[in-house]
Amino acid sequence: MDSYKTQWLTSEGDERVRCELLAFGTVEDLERGTLNAQDRNVLVKLSILNYVYGKQVVTFDALLKNYAQAGIELTDNDIEMILLELCNHGIMDVSIDSVAREVKVLQLSRYRDVYCGERELLVVNPTKVITNIEIIDTLQAYSDKL
């Protein structure tokens, strides 16, 4: 199956918006585009990955607040189930402390498409996507530390 980005590059209309949201978006972008229930669930999972990217510890309150701002009500159990599903798929590895209500991010694999300016973004905020320039800068900073 092609990546959402590959589909986005060749699609038009509603399908383009759908693929753009799934390739680069988060739940915060939903107000500018609509998704069916299945795609919305995928975006909820992808949004967790976006939120934890670059963080070592994330609180349940922060995750729940992030979703609430997008009009999506989740429970602690919902968050735990999503995290466990992502771990089972090998996308990430976390340590969940249900009592302290926090998640320690142990490992996060490449998980989202990278925006390289191929087309204009219609619904996703371009300042919030992972770009090729950001990746190059991160690699350069890492290389400089060696």
Curated annotation (Swiss-Prot):
GO cellular component annotations of the record: COP9 signalosome; cytoplasm
| Keyword Nucleus listed | yes
Q: Keywords, A to Z? A: Cytoplasm, Nucleus, Signalosome
What InterPro entries does the record tag this protein with?
Csn9_fungi
Q: Where in the cell is it found?
A: Cytoplasm; Nucleus
Q: Its Gene Ontology biological processes?
A: protein deneddylation
**Domain PCI intervals:** 1-107
User: Is Cytoplasm there in the keyword field?
Assistant: yes
Assembly mode: Component of a COP9 signalosome-like (CSN) complex.
* Function of the molecule: Component of the COP9 signalosome (CSN) complex that acts as a regulator of the ubiquitin (Ubl) conjugation pathway by mediating the deneddylation of the cullin subunit of SCF-type E3 ubiquitin-protein ligase complexes. The CSN complex is involved in the regulation of the mating pheromone response.
- The name under which this protein is listed is COP9 signalosome complex subunit 9
**Native species:** Candida glabrata (strain ATCC 2001 / BCRC 20586 / JCM 3761 / NBRC 0622 / NRRL Y-65 / CBS 138) (Yeast)
